[in-house]
Every structure is written in C-alpha cells, then in structure tokens.
C-alpha cells in the first residue's frame, strides 16, 4: 500500500448514506462568510455519481425560480455536514443528463419502493 493510499483512507467518511442516480437528496453544506459559518441546504435530484475513493463526486440538479441549477459535491468533503435521502428514484440509467432538456411533468422520476 502506497503512502498516498494511507492518507486517502484516513480522510474517507463513513457517515455517507447509500444513494445513486435518481434519488432526491438534501445536502447540508457549511458556508463560511467572514468569521461566521452557517448551513445551507441544497435539495435536488442526483444526476450522476462518478469516480471512487477520496475523489468520488456527485452532481445534484434542481430548478430554482425556473432556472436549472446543478452543483457538484465531493462525497468525502469536510464542507458537507450531512446528506439526507428524501426519496429513491426508479431510473434505468447511471447518468441522467436527459433531465436537462425536460420541463415540468416530463422531468418527474418514479419512486422506487
């Protein structure tokens, strides 16, 4: 095992819930403004999850005031306070880029039971 692998293993988080593309999440992100810090909640649908280990990331998409907003988070980032899984989506793809063109009811995802 290389030295870098040991450093990476020490920084992996173990409090991340199981989720995949199509799931709706609440991501509580620590935002530091000057000397104050607060939590900001970003709620949306996971459209992709890629890489593995310490470099693993996921992208969440939501529509805010009619504008599509996507944000990519590192899974093991210390800036993420917690992740809540709100619903599990039933999808047949690992990357849901087609949701970018969908509007309204066409962008809905069925819930997995």
From Swiss-Prot:
GO biological process, one term: translation
Domain of life, source organism: Bacteria
Protein name: Large ribosomal subunit protein bL19
Family: Belongs to the bacterial ribosomal protein bL19 family.
Gene3D superfamilies listed in its UniProt record: 2.30.30.790
Cellular component terms per the entry's GO annotation: cytosolic large ribosomal subunit
Cleavable signal peptide: none
NCBIfam families the record matches: rplS_bact
Keywords for the protein's UniProt record, in alphabetical order: Ribonucleoprotein, Ribosomal protein
Tagged with keyword Ribosomal protein: yes
Keyword ATP-binding: no
Cysteine disulfide links: none
Gene assigned in the entry: rplS
Record organism: Corynebacterium jeikeium (strain K411)
Role summary: This protein is located at the 30S-50S ribosomal subunit interface and may play a role in the structure and function of the aminoacyl-tRNA binding site.
A Pfam family: Ribosomal_L19
GO molecular function, one term: structural constituent of ribosome
């Amino acid at each position: 095992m290389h030295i870098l692998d040991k450093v990476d293993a020490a920084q992996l988080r173990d409090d991340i819930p199981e989720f995949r593309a199509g799931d709706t999440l609440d991501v509580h992100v620590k935002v530091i403004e000057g000397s104050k810090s607060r939590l900001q909640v970003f709620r949306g649908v996971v459209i992709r999850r890629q890489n593995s280990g310490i470099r693993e990331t996921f992208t969440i998409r939501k529509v805010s005031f009619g504008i599509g907003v996507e944000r990519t988070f590192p899974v093991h980032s210390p800036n993420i306070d917690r992740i809540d899984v709100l619903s599990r989506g039933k999808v047949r793809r690992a990357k849901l880029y087609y949701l970018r063109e969908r509007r309204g009811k066409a962008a809905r995802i069925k819930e997995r039971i």
